[in-house]
């Protein structure tokens, strides 16, 4: 039974916080919706942080044509939600997540089969790949839903998952059970490998390069049990000390926060000493079109090597020592660190399987470019997330980011940008 609009608005906000608390998403990633009638649902808006989202911020969307009410734009994945309600009359709550294990398992493009006594059904299909917000992705998910009428979830290759339920609780149960099932399958491949790296790290502890925050010419650095404040103007440009590395990064980027990431999967990839190409959309968007690895050729030049690896990116690896993430806010750098960990786990999983391909360079560069151009500036900003009501012509004419745009508009932008990239035009850089 559909919710009243007031019930749906309150429930979606509560569910958004629950989603973050359960570790099934972060920031504005993913989206949630609730059916309010046979013709409409309410959905989270585009680019607004869950921490400041309120019931009145949700958007009412019409299932038949995706038109919407109010002065906020709905999630770019509104079409996927509409299809879920259209194809599944019994569904009243939909959650799209970027949950870790389901995302990693989905990079192969395989269905999750062999499930028994599961709320998910006997099989969870994996929808074919499509760029976020595009008609291609929407159609792929709709095809998966149509072909698997008993499944309560759909994996989205290189992206995340869609979980359905007759109510909020059953949709959450589907998300949690999906994560548990995918963790088991991923663990069958990764657990032994990661255990070996953890044992090596215990025997030969790697340096802790710490985390820091910059204010003006000064930065506060904490590594191990040490916390100190440094003046950028007085830190030597060479040497392998944590302070020298952080200072070099601050001098060459616009970062305000830095974190040294030492998770098992990140360390494992750093030992290979190679550039990591993203297998997941969110890593390409947030970290960069690839994650370079700074090499340990000369301790004195290490700060420069790390800072150069981070140019135009928000994450880089350091050979044998994990990785570094940077951001303009504490939230940005924490998000980059969590995505680097998940992305490295996906890359290691792909390496061990041997039959997975990363995102194409065009898709990875395009997602990074459009994320920097728009979506990253909107997160957490209520004023920026608002939009004046548009006519159909205005909506068609507006160019938006892949993550935010209406599906048809993004499809056009995607093709144009991809063609430009194929012709060799440089992608924009940031840091």
Model-derived segments and spans:
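Glycine-rich flexible loops
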Residues: 1-391, 403-406, 410-431
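Low-complexity, intrinsically disordered Ser/Thr/Pro- and acidic-rich segments
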Residues: 395-399
